[in-house]
Amino acid sequence: MAKRQLNRRQNWRIEKIQGERAARAAKREQHALQELEGGDLGPEQLGLVIAHFGVQVEVEAQDGETAGQVFRCHLRANLPALVTGDRVVWRAGNQGIGVIVAQMPRSTELCRPNNHGQLKPVAANVDLIVIVFAPAPEPHPNLIDRYLVAAEHAGLRPLLLLNKADLINDENGPGLHALLEVYRELGYPLLEVSAHHGDGMQRLQQQLDGHISVFVGQSGVGKSSLVNSLLPDAGTRVGDLSEWSGQGTHTTTTARLYHFPNGGDLIDSPGIREFGLGHVSRDDVEDGFIEFRDLFGTCRFRDCKHDREPGCALLKALEEGRIKPQRMNSYRSIIASLAEDSY
């Protein structure tokens, strides 16, 4: 059954109610923070944000007698938006509650625009982005390519991960193998695993050890199952595919950071069906298509749009098979989705 469309007045009323609730929550949080800061606070110490719950976060103490312990912390109003993976300075209060007083500089951040077009960080201080897809829901090359552009833009190393490899059959196998071959030819690291059967999980663990990684991908591709297989004590809830849509049901509601026994961390983020790139420029997108890089600037016309123009280096490469149609379609789709002012 299709979702009922809301009219403008209904949308306005929903936003108004949500805004009022958010304002009341913020007022309660500010009152709690004032009471906390009015009492005795411990010395400043370093911490790591391991989960975010709206107006509060969970912080793991990084030094001192409480190192390794987790505290629920309030946020001072003058702080920038914090995300899982942020390193912070915090002070402990009473009853296991603390206050974050400063954010440490980020080495990297993975961002995406929200529904209002405002840039929203997803995870901080990550160095490996694991792009997860599966035979079902059907993988979309455009979404994979959007993640690859985001990885290049953020300076993160990508790892393509096909989960549920045990579901490959005669029907979906040819298309999947053709999809994977495109990225293998480009030199992207790629693994095939099955979190359910354990196939390939040891090789995946070796790739993750020593890195701060984030799993991204559509809902339903098995990110939570991967976390449960890698970290059995994590207890991440697993969801099924929606019967009517074939899309995954969301299970992870907030990004959470987990530690690996041999070193390294994993951030499990909520499922993302559409990954916007409105915060990047045309140059950033072009840089994200690694096989296109040497071709840009070699077209006959300086303002070539790589559509039907004569003397286009990209169209020639496409005709000669040096660029795959799948990648060209993704490039055109992403460029078309950019805001006019990013050109």
Curated annotation (Swiss-Prot):
GO terms for molecular function: GTP binding; GTPase activity; metal ion binding; rRNA binding. It is found in: Cytoplasm. One of its GO terms (cellular component) is cytoplasm. This is Small ribosomal subunit biogenesis GTPase RsgA. Belongs to the TRAFAC class YlqF/YawG GTPase family. RsgA subfamily. Residues 116-275 form the CP-type G domain. Its main location: cytoplasm. Its cofactor is Zn(2+). Its EC number is 3.6.1.-. One of several proteins that assist in the late maturation steps of the functional core of the 30S ribosomal subunit. Helps release RbfA from mature subunits. May play a role in the assembly of ribosomal proteins into the subunit. Circularly permuted GTPase that catalyzes slow GTP hydrolysis, GTPase activity is stimulated by the 30S ribosomal subunit. It comes from the Bacteria. Binds 1 zinc ion per subunit. Monomer. Associates with 30S ribosomal subunit, binds 16S rRNA. Keywords: Cytoplasm, GTP-binding, Hydrolase, Metal-binding, Nucleotide-binding, Ribosome biogenesis, RNA-binding, rRNA-binding, Zinc. Zn(2+) binds at C299, C304, H306, C312. InterPro entries: G_CP_dom, NA-bd_OB-fold, P-loop_NTPase, Ribosome_biogen_GTPase_RsgA, RsgA_GTPase_dom.
